[in-house]
Amino acid sequence: MFSMCKQTHSATAVEFSIACRFFNNLDENLVVAGANVLKVYRIAPNVEASQRQKLNPSEMRLAPKMRLECLATYTLYGNVMSLQCVSLAGAMRDALLISFKDAKLSVLQHDPDTFALKTLSLHYFEEDDIRGGWTGRYFVPTVRVDPDSRCAVMLVYGKRLVVLPFRKDNSLDEIELADVKPIKKAPTAMVSRTPIMASYLIALRDLDEKIDNVLDIQFLHGYYEPTLLILYEPVRTCPGRIKVRSDTCVLVAISLNIQQRVHPIIWTVNSLPFDCLQVYPIQKPIGGCLVMTVNAVIYLNQSVPPYGVSLNSSADNSTAFPLKPQDGVRISLDCANFAFIDVDKLVISLRTGDLYVLTLCVDSMRTVRNFHFHKAAASVLTSCICVLHSEYIFLGSRLGNSLLLHFTEEDQSTVITLDEVEQQSEQQQRNLQDEDQNLEEIFDVDQLEMAPTQAKSRRIEDEELEVYGSGAKASVLQLRKFIFEVCDSLMNVAPINYMCAGERVEFEEDGVTLRPHAESLQDLKIELVAATGHSKNGALSVFVNCINPQIITSFELDGCLDVWTVFDDATKKSSRNDQHDFMLLSQRNSTLVLQTGQEINEIENTGFTVNQPTIFVGNLGQQRFIVQVTTRHVRLLQGTRLIQNVPIDVGSPVVQVSIADPYVCLRVLNGQVITLALRETRGTPRLAINKHTISSSPAVVAISAYKDLSGLFTVKGDDINLTGSSNSAFGHSFGGYMKAEPNMKVEDEEDLLYGDAGSAFKMNSMADLAKQSKQKNSDWWRRLLVQAKPSYWLVVARQSGTLEIYSMPDMKLVYLVNDVGNGSMVLTDAMEFVPISLTTQENSKAGIVQACMPQHANSPLPLELSVIGLGLNGERPLLLVRTRVELLIYQVFRYPKGHLKIRFRKMDQLNLLDQQPTHIDLDENDEQEEIESYQMQPKYVQKLRPFANVGGLSGVMVCGVNPCFVFLTFRGELRIHRLLGNGDVRSFAAFNNVNIPNGFLYFDTTYELKISVLPSYLSYDSVWPVRKVPLRCTPRQLVYHRENRVYCLITQTEEPMTKYYRFNGEDKELSEESRGERFIYPIGSQFEMVLISPETWEIVPDASITFEPWEHVTAFKIVKLSYEGTRSGLKEYLCIGTNFNYSEDITSRGNIHIYDIIEVVPEPGKPMTKFKIKEIFKKEQKGPVSAISDVLGFLVTGLGQKIYIWQLRDGDLIGVAFIDTNIYVHQIITVKSLIFIADVYKSISLLRFQEEYRTLSLASRDFNPLEVYGIEFMVDNSNLGFLVTDAERNIIVYMYQPEARESLGGQKLLRKADYHLGQVVNTMFRVQCHQKGLHQRQPFLYENKHFVVYGTLDGALGYCLPLPEKVYRRFLMLQNVLLSYQEHLCGLNPKEYRTLKSSKKQGINPSRCIIDGDLIWSYRLMANSERNEVAKKIGTRTEEILGDLLEIERLASVF
């Protein structure tokens, strides 16, 4: 069985985050990684353009509200295991160090020339002698970097340290000279100067023979040589054995002398508590480190005695280490994350989501004398924490949305003496209890998503520093207050615990929900619903991968080819200046003018011309005027009054118009470009033709005028910092923090520098030190607020395939790209090194343009261009180039060399292979063409339609056969969403009206004008449009009940419990434990089943089932069982299997519950109460009910290792057959009479049920051990495969082939294909392949095939699809060529990544046979010439491959 695996929704979980200067040394960026995705964000002001004009950045004291903006995304062929950054000697930016399993390390850096990641060095330590006999893949390769950037270390296989030394920056002069002079030395001389020196290995046993089971490694601050702390446990223990062996952890500090390669141990601490988790170094001037254990915090320093506190009463019994109980605190640091926000303060995020601020109270000797804990907020469950710009904190999460918080420290400067401390702290404790109640409500993450502003300026922390001194002395304390405020959140749909497909709810024209009964399964519109998140971050996520617009109304207009909407004179309107007033429809020979208000009416006798076809209509002069362009005229109107009519008489019709207010650019059929500008002299507006023109040969085939607000399009070099904004204002004052403090006199300043008088400015506390460093960093957001002056540019494409950029109005050529239709990854200026004098008018025609003919003969010609500023306030310009085969989407990035300081980097490429060819046939009769050319022709209708506000979003609509929306929001990520169905959109316009707010209108193939809105409940700034319904508890299993069209969901809530059952034989008694105030009680789970209606996505009231305490739901399915009394029909029932988890001493027992959902008359005013749940059967079983399914109308249950078949009769279950299997069956699926079961440890088995004999028998099984997570059938016409996902993140396909010799006569299932996915899959379902689309390929190759959709615990979605053999062979050859053809990011080989991974040595080779869809799809993004070369190598045509890809894309876009 040949198949392909492709990921369609990338992972959204965040596991690692660091702050680093990724693009340049001025700006700090946030780099996050999760699974195999790496993203780079910047913190940017969230200020609209209208507000920004009123702000003066230099006068603002406080930073505005901030947002996270994604600047780069990289998908890797390997999961990130550890992420760090380092500043290398003489580098313009930081380098990233990323480790991968089992022992790979890549050093990477941003490449400013191509806006890509370049690999600086690769380090590989997976040889067998380094492995030391280990076959398991248990060890995480942890990377740590010395704070002074002298070296980095990586722990491999838990037994060895890799040391990566960095060269010191000795001579700055040499580096500066090297930038200027060409290097003529031999390559060997170059190698010796690289910033990264040769790496080497240290075996930990050589340092100390006891070092084993390493828990954490960290570098200490402030040592002359790099000093590494290693926390390890030489002899392991566990909580059940601490009476025998406790305090097993040891901390050693090793000094790394890199030159001599000697590594003495300089400091050892023995007998640390057995539950040590991590160690955190503390910066100078305090120094030392904090050791975090599950129940305690310990401060260690080489020169002072240790100081530790216990955080709960468990620490008192589990360790002999001297710990002082911490008053008022009862927490556990298990699964907690930590980050220093100051030298003496760190934020702790607990596994419950609570945020605490821990202050180290330091005495005058810089020794930690006390800890002060303070509960600051309740937030998301974090996986990592990172501090940015010293006042922002990023909480990365795998289980909920990641958050960006802003924290500010207010200084009340209240001076109090030690006597007041006691009363103060008591009073504060009372205040805090009240405050905590409010905080729990404010800071819970899902409410933040809905109303982040509520959380503004809440008082979070009001804390005093406790100072221990002699009682007589009055020590001075300062009260400090922290304010936390949520700025932004990143959507995350991980982990996908369970998912299913359900029917989509349709909306009728009047907004009523409509549930059409599909004629056939092929017409069924389905959506993907997933149970995502955990605990209070739990949610139901509804995914759609095609937008289904809500059609408000539609009417038929025969012969209309194009549509526009425009505004009336903005000065006449008082408030509603953003609503469209006129709609113009162009027909082949005429134009319709409609006025749009409460109603849409045709108007006549206006200044608009109606007896000619309109080419374009738009607004000019800040929406005060309207310009209408026909094939022969340009008309300027104010409202409906004609002001000016400019005839265009150049012997050829106008075919394309582009506007950048106040410029109007026209393209004439014969290749000329005419530009007009709006001038208002003495109050009379008129359009003036620009006397500057551009050459008309080779003929211009596409134009786009662009008004730049981003400041990227500039030819000046002096106003360029290396930042993303142009700023002459702040370029000079970037060293602003060197200015005198306002409260210092000048003479004091000199004393401070040179004399003793400086002692007047001694620091009060550690915090004052940090305050000064904070002030110096406050320039960064001011730079981002400076507004760039608008500039105007004309982008044209010529018949020769070149793309040219001209500055307006002087029409000077500033940028020239050869062969733009080739679609190179980076577009560069061919004139970068041409003297500017050549770009004058005379020389440009002959000299440059002739020399720039396309290099590649087969490059498709550009047919249409669009340059549009997307993102917030148009700060992210995109270039869209449409050719016959595809749409190329480029982003603009700053490039300081060259004339115009930009380059273009390809972001994505859309396959438009189905579009009808639009080139002109040359064999037509010339006279006929002359008459027709002045009429409106469909081939000239623009396919790229920019819009400013559709549902609050701006972007581009790509019309045609595969219509789709292209969005790039303020979050900075490109989103492409297709329209559902196989409709062809002819033309499109945004439409804002009283009745249709922020909607749009479009023509489909039937000449129907559809007025629609985007459904507002979906979030479009996501890989797939998604709706997240918060549940505030963990969602477990989820099923769709098709008869009643309702979702059934199992939820789990957790709360501490003080009671438990004591068992005496069969009797059980409930006993209550009381362990004191500081004891942390265990967590108990309460399960419940609820119904959720897909019309409102609310829980149906009074239709839930609450299970008993201690009863866990282990299996849940909708089963089709035979009706009572009638043998023919089957009815859907809800079947739930449970298990009572009491303790390890009691045999597990469970219940089988069977329920029916019945419809009743809803209560008045409560339409949701139409469902009730009726219990059919409930009975205790002799074991845990671990899996459920149905076969031929019978019920199949797995009770641990036994499989039972039951018949439902008279409200009771009657046993029919049973069989014993391996260890513990946790999943059962059936098809016809075959039962496919998954064992938790012993792989899979195939059973057969024979109804006439009432027997259940084992047909075949896999003999190798395998920890199975999920199973599903692979249906390929008449072939049946068994798809399995396992604990090692692989996908394996088995088949039953009794004729094959190696199957031992059918006893053994054969492994036919395997593939390493790299993410854990727990849930899958099947969908039948349907042929959708206008131009259907014959024959349809995917008849009777099913594809399997999977969801991962990292928030990714994908599918496995059986391929026809012909397509598989073509893809396999393509895959083999691409493996060596493309450069490997981070040095990771896709083939190695996709090879089956196993920790046990098995005597079988990898089967492969599954195509890597992600690698195949990368073929689309290659340049046209490269694609042709690759296709030639495998003996096929590019169109064949692109056709296959398009067909598979169509099959998969059913949601």
UniProtKB/Swiss-Prot annotation:
The lineage of its organism: Eukaryota, Metazoa, Ecdysozoa, Arthropoda, Hexapoda. Keywords: mRNA processing, Nucleus, RNA-binding. Component of the cleavage and polyadenylation specificity factor (CPSF) complex that plays a key role in pre-mRNA 3'-end formation, recognizing the AAUAAA signal sequence and interacting with poly(A) polymerase and other factors to bring about cleavage and poly(A) addition. This subunit is involved in the RNA recognition step of the polyadenylation reaction. One of its GO terms (biological process) is mRNA 3'-end processing. Component of the cleavage and polyadenylation specificity factor (CPSF) complex, composed of at least Clp, Cpsf73, Cpsf100 and Cpsf160. One of its GO terms (molecular function) is myosin binding. It comes from Drosophila melanogaster (Fruit fly). Gene3D superfamilies: 1.10.150.910, YVTN repeat-like/Quinoprotein amine dehydrogenase. This is Cleavage and polyadenylation specificity factor subunit 1. It comes from the Eukaryota. Belongs to the CPSF1 family. It is found in: Nucleus. GO terms for cellular component: mRNA cleavage and polyadenylation specificity factor complex; nucleus.
